[in-house]
């Protein structure tokens, strides 16, 4: 709530007042398959409009599984979105959106690498069938939302009703290829069936605009049910050390309710100076239930015969205040302070969870930011820059503990992120443009007592085999995982006219980031992704009115092999200790064609 750490807003297109349709097809030479999308939109009657959009994907993956000869992960997905807009009068309209998605991914995207060297991700893996199901992911989801707007004079009353549902199952294997050569046994595998549904309702009132004081007030409510099953299988055969076959199981159930009231006001002191303030009060209630058991096997390899029950009731008040000043109509400066919060919760999939370790605390953040937004040189140059300082209290973290082979969810006492962000766009002529976005940040733990041992810590500082040593560990000053000091995105676009009717549109983009830890134990070897840059390009040909087009598209043309996360798969869970890392998409070249009606 009031999230200074960032939020994502996705707005899809609505029905149009005139008929239109489009279709686009993409064939990937590297993923060996097509992607087809299209939409049709227009009025059904004078008061009702509709838009239907669909997308289908049938592509192979970018990693060869040497066990079955398949390129993984294979992606088969279908998505459909229907949007209806009903406007019987000038003062009322209602928008209904229904979205359905079905996705099946066959195979995995993790590969093995040595524990004692920097990351060496390959584009091959070896993964055999496990007893609990084929490796991959299946997801089915429904999203339904209805938004009604009623004009009451100069005021607007808005109602938003939402329903969300998904069920999924993820089955994980881990690459059995031994980095030194050969393969090893499929000794550990797991599955995570999930089920979620939520109802929500929001009502808000928007005041007239263009006045000295403008405001929005509203209320929000949601209720949700979440269920998670965990199956952990083992097939270990290390003679003289450990011979074990078993299946462990945990079950988690949670019901939650959330209610909030909020308001935001803008006070226009002058045409150039304004203050924007907001305040949100939130009440959250949750009930959670957890239990574990041994489904099969001679004994529990981990402490699974545990139960936990808990409930929480929390309330938060999250304010923000922003001052904006227009030096000119093209240059605006601002400064803002905001407080955000995230409700606490329950550990859902850690073996051996008890009442004492079941609950984690809510997270709070404070953010100070200042910046300038400007449009200069008669619109040919756009410059924006901002600086920020964000602090987190009880930062919620989920860390993989390789000594226990479990993910542990809890709170870091405090953390902070400071940085500067900037963007620029330059339009030197009508058919040429350049854009640049860059950011520098310093994100670290300020205080984290009881943290899992880091790979860089000597055993005299933190010994994972000694509970007292691990409990006394504090990794204050260590960087937050998955955060780079520097990141950037650069793009150049040129439009070349071929006579009066046709054009060639060329776009080249370069994006990258500096090194970062992508393993929870922050190994300076297998757990650190080095800095990289990825080159993308697109060349499109078609008429000026864009009725149709053909294009060649290249992504990651430098073929950088980067990883999203990594962890240590240790002995004796496997006879061949190795790093497991998740390989991001490699080079992909495709051809695209589209037509508009």
Give the positions of each predicted feature:
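C-terminal beta-signal and adjacent terminal beta-strands/loops
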Residues: 510-521, 541-597
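Membrane-embedded beta-barrel scaffold of Gram-negative outer-membrane proteins
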Residues: 145-174, 326-342, 359-427, 433-439, ...
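Outer-membrane beta-barrel translocator/receptor signature
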Residues: 1-65, 70-80, 91-92, 142, ...
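Solvent-exposed loop segments that connect transmembrane elements
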Residues: 63-71, 108-132, 173-191, 231-251, ...
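Outer-membrane beta-barrel proteins
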Residues: 26-35, 57-89, 124-142, 184-200, ...
């Amino acid at each position: 709530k009031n999230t200074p750490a960032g939020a994502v807003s996705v707005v899809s297109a609505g029905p149009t007042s005139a008929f239109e349709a489009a279709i686009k097809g993409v064939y990937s030479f590297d993923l060996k398959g097509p992607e087809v999308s299209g939409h049709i939109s227009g009025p059904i009657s004078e008061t009702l409009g509709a838009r239907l959009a669909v997308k289908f994907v049938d592509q192979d993956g970018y990693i060869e599984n040497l066990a079955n000869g398949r390129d993984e992960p294979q992606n088969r997905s279908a998505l459909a979105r229907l949007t209806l807009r009903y406007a019987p009068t000038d003062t009322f309209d209602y928008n209904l959106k229904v979205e359905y998605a079905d996705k099946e991914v066959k195979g995995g995207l993790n590969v093995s690498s040595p524990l004692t060297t920097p990351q060496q991700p390959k584009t091959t893996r070896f993964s055999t069938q496990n007893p609990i199901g084929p490796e991959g992911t299946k997801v089915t989801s429904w999203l339904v939302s209805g938004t009604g707007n009623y004009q009451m004079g100069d005021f607007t009353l808005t109602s938003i009703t939402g329903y969300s549902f998904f069920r999924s199952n993820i089955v994980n294997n881990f690459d059995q290829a031994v980095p030194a050569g050969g393969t090893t046994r499929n000794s550990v595998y797991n599955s995570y069936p999930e089920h979620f549904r939520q109802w929500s309702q929001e009502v808000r009132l928007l005041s007239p605009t263009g006045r000295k004081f403008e405001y929005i007030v509203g209320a929000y409510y949601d209720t949700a049910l979440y269920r998670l099953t965990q199956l952990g299988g083992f097939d270990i055969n290390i003679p003289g050390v450990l011979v074990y076959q078993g299946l462990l199981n945990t079950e988690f159930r949670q019901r939650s309710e959330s209610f909030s009231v909020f308001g935001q006001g803008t006070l226009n002191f002058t045409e150039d100076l304004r203050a924007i303030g907001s305040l949100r009060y939130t009440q959250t209630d949750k009930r959670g239930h957890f239990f574990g058991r041994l489904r099969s096997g001679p004994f529990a390899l981990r402490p699974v015969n545990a139960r936990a029950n808990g409930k929480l009731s929390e309330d938060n008040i999250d304010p923000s205040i922003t001052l904006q000043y227009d030096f000119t109509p093209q240059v605006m400066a601002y400064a803002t302070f905001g407080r955000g919060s995230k409700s606490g919760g329950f550990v859902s999939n850690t073996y051996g969870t008890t009442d004492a370790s079941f609950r984690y605390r809510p997270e709070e953040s404070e953010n100070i930011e200042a910046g300038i937004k400007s449009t200069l040189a008669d619109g040919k140059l756009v410059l924006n820059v901002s600086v920020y300082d964000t602090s987190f209290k009880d930062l919620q973290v989920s860390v993989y503990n390789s000594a226990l082979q479990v993910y542990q969810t809890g709170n870091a006492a405090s953390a902070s992120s400071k940085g500067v962000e900037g963007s620029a766009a330059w339009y030197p002529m009508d058919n040429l443009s350049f854009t640049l976005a860059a950011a520098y940040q310093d994100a670290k733990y300020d205080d984290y007592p009881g943290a899992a041992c880091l790979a860089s810590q000597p055993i005299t500082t933190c010994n994972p085999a000694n509970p007292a040593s691990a409990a006394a560990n504090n990794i204050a000053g260590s960087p937050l995982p998955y955060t780079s000091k520097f990141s950037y995105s650069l793009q150049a676009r040129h439009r070349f006219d071929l006579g009066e009717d046709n054009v060639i549109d060329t776009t080249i983009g370069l994006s990258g980031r500096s090194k970062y830890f992508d393993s929870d134990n922050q190994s300076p070897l297998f757990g650190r992704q080095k800095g990289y840059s990825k080159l993308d390009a697109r060349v499109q040909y078609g008429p000026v009115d864009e009725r149709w087009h053909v294009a060649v598209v290249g992504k990651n043309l430098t073929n950088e092999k980067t990883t999203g996360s990594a962890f240590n798969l240790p002995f004796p869970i496997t006879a061949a200790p190795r790093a497991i890392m998740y390989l991001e998409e490699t080079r992909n070249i495709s051809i695209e064609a589209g037509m508009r009606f």
